[in-house]
């Protein structure tokens, strides 16, 4: 039943309403390794292909009017993968940023990073700081790359920070509202996610943006991330526009 409801494959390019574009889209870029395995390639080739697709999707998202695109680049759980693959992923992230930050800057894309960056190498931290500094005044789409990110970890860190603020008298417990908590998260500059996209057939959120996904619409596809295209993105947006977002309320006819 889930497959019948949620699996979508790109067909002809769908029409979308330019006045109803989701402001904040999140993507779990899944399936790189499986994509490579099906082609008899090493997993590293899948990750490289996925990095190339991200560049194209960022520009496509900006063109259709999405304001923020948050992508899952490396999770807190990914450290459990084989050391060789972790090293490859870190090298690929550095390579991606070194080769693409200037391109993104030229296309007016702002780059931000969410997650516990302090656990990454000094070299990668510098690349991250430089990318954010270079693009900080850009006014197009904001690309948020989640690196060493976990939704539970984010919430725990936020609780600690709020607790410290109460202890030092900066705030009282009465100040702790949903809006205040949102303002303390890594994603504090942006509204909650409107649309979550996950390729590669899995129906789970994998500890991604747990707070921010509270009322998001979910869209799944059998396609692996390296096969994702602008047309796939448009199909996801078109499906989103057909949904009735109720935020806990009733349907119009109920």
List where the protein language model places each region:
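Flexible, compositionally biased loop and terminal segments
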Residues: 1-254
């Amino acid at each position: 039943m889930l497959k019948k409801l949620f699996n979508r494959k790109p067909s002809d390019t769908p029409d979308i309403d330019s006045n109803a574009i989701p402001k904040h889209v999140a993507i779990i870029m899944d399936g790189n390794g499986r994509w490579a395995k099906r082609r008899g390639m090493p997993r590293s080739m899948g990750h490289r292909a996925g990095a190339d697709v991200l560049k194209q999707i960022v520009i496509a998202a900006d063109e259709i009017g999405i304001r923020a695109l948050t992508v899952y680049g490396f999770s807190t759980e990914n450290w459990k993968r084989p050391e060789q693959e972790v090293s490859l992923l870190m090298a690929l992230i550095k390579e991606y940023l070194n080769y693409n930050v200037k391109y993104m800057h030229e296309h007016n894309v702002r780059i931000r990073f969410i997650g516990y960056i302090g656990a990454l190498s000094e070299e990668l931290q510098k690349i991250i700081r430089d990318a954010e500094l270079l693009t900080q005044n850009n006014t197009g789409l904001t690309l948020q790359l989640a690196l060493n990110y976990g939704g539970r970890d984010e919430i725990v860190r936020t609780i600690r920070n709020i607790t410290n603020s109460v202890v030092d008298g900066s705030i009282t417990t009465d100040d702790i509202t949903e809006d205040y908590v949102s303002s303390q998260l890594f994603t504090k500059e942006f509204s909650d996610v409107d649309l979550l996209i996950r390729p590669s057939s899995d129906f789970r959120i994998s500890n991604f943006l747990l707070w921010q996904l509270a009322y998001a619409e979910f869209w799944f596809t059998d396609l692996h991330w390296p096969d994702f295209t602008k047309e796939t993105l448009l199909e996801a947006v078109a499906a989103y526009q057909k949904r009735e977002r109720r935020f806990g309320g009733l349907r119009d006819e109920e």
